[in-house]
Amino acid sequence: MKLLKLMSIMTLSAAAAACTSGNKPLASGIDLANMDTTYQPGESFYMYATGGWQKANPLTAEYSRYGSFDVLQENNNKQLRELIEGVSAQENAPGSVAQKIASLYRSAMDSVNLNEHYWGTLEEFLLCDGYQSSRDVTENWLRDVWPRMQRQGVPGLFGMYICADEKDSKNNLVSIYQGGLTLGQKDYYVDDDPETQRIREAYKTYVVALCQHQGFSEKDARRIWADVIRIETRLARASKSMTELRDPEANYNKISYKELKQQFPGIDWDAYFQNIGMEGVREVCLGQPAAIHEVEAVLKEEPVEALQNVYLWHALNMASSYIDDESRALNFAFYGTAMSGKQEDRPRWKRAVSSVEGALGEALGQLYVERFFPPEAKERMERLVANLQVALGERIAVQEWMSDETKKVAQDKLDAFYVKVGYPNKWKDYSTLEIGDSYLRNILACNEWELQEMVRTKFNKPVDRDEWYMTPQTVNAYYNPTTNEICFPAGILQPPFFDMEADDAFNYGAIGVVIGHEMTHGFDDQGSQYDKEGNLRRWWSDEDRQRFEERIQVMRAFHDSIEVLPGLHANGSLTLGENMADHGGLMVSFQAFQNATKQAPLPVIDGFTPEQRFFLAYANVWGQNIRDEEIRKRVKSDPHELGKWRVDGQLPHIDAWYDAFGITEQDPMFVPKAERVTIW
């Protein structure tokens, strides 16, 4: 896809007016039943706009959080199921993409085979990968089995990926990064608050129960647990926190392969990369050197049997969702219930659809686009994106805290955005992937194929800017700093985000803010450190950067002050980038909305002005119900603010919202103008 060329404001306004006029007037897009008018707009705009929706959509046992994204995902799941079952009902040529989709889905749905015959497959997997119950192991196990298991998707003591070199963005670079943590991040291992202690105790219960279910005695299962928690805690203490990982400069450390072997001699790098299928490594990026040094120490100091137990656990944990029902139930009891508060697992068909989507996402996406994504939706979305680019450029131009020199570079970066809408221009080739009748074998084959594809397409090769990092059916969007691209998959281009039947007040308030959000990521605390080519490079003047940091500190402090549960505050540092993107998305989209309707103002509908409908549409994107366990988990690990605070924490800093609803200092949400965040 070529870069969209920016048109003049008048031309864009005419285009926008044309798409909102015609023989049939467009609707407001606002469902009044979603509102709860027992609240005043300035009391809690979130409850005012979405309280009715929350009452009408109580949490079911399957969900720990249910909101607009989930409504759309449910609809997508039904559409994907229809596509998959349609393919499965056909006669498909062996080796065809259709056969692979059908076979993977059938293997996931075959509960009889999963429950009666899983053990042979699991035993074959474990023995093939070197786990021997006799404990007859050698040092070769560490050298050879470790990377083989990683090839099949079993997490190792560290991670490896091939992606763009952040300081030479046209070329790919091997990246080595911290890993080995079943719980995902260090806080769960090092924090001592009662909630974290509860999670660790539930983790112990899960490890022991799953190991016993697979035939280990209670004594052996507890020994496995002791080895797992000891070694994972060692790795956690040497790892960086989620907030520390947000600093791109601090996590960039490129060295030659020779230097890698010299500085980290405790790992047999030659054997590791050969077993992965990567010979000829020239350079690597060590994101978190301290964590890799701790891996060396663990390999040197821990008994081989203990290391083997860790890998056994990682393999069992990975496999537990793809074998018998009891293993899956134990997995869900921990990840679903203990960590998130869910009371009931997803039905088998949803899990099966998710597996097909994860393994054959673009193949399924091609069918999805052909059936469910009209060309006119792509065209209108591209016009909206172009309008938002103009508006962001206008906002950059009027910022008094930026020098003209920095503004010029920022505008150049904005003009260089690579815009992707709907679906990729080229599709993945799955011809070398083999799918059979065993669910676990299929998942292992898919994992290995993904790694081989990464090596084949990226190792010692330039970056392919046409690669998509989400499938077309994904209900999400992204900005990628190393390619300076914004991407909006077809899956999100549906109500309540995008509605071809609704007017511009709705679409700018919903999908328009999403567009502006992703664009602003190019200028948030992280994205602003990358230039228009995607290179990590300081392009700001020192004075401008200092003024920028002062402004974002206001946002950080405001969100730190938010109490999401009694005694639990939001983490304004972890959520800083997303909060900046929400704020920028609102500011930019509202300006684009004003530009688009300047020549043809929209009417009042259902008693709401166009400006009011803009903010109501925005709030409805974030309506949700959520369990306390899920809130605690997200505050610890999610860089996004909770839905309520993406509304009530953002709108008090938007002057246009005050004007639209007549908010005054008597309203609880009122923030004095001098204290409001003003960045873009």
What are these regions (language model features)?
Residues K2-I9:
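Sec-dependent signal peptide recognition
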Residues K5, Q73, V228, Q263-G266, ...:
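Intrinsically disordered, low-complexity linker/terminal regions across diverse proteins
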Residues A15-A18:
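C-terminal motif of bacterial Sec signal peptides marking the signal peptidase cleavage site
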Residues T20-G29:
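Bacterial Sec signal peptide processing site at the extreme N-terminus
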Residues N34-K55, Y189, D193-Q212, L576, ...:
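Hydrophobic/aromatic-rich, well-ordered segments within soluble, folded domains that form packed cores
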Residues Q40-E43, Y48-N113:
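Active-site-surrounding "flap" and adjacent substrate/cofactor-binding loops of secreted or lumenal enzymes
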Residues E62-I84, K219-A238, N507-V513, D606, ...:
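Short secondary-structure subsegments characteristic of cysteine-rich extracellular domains
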Residues G86-R383, N387:
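Noncatalytic, helix-rich "gating/capping" subdomain that lines the substrate-entry/channel surface
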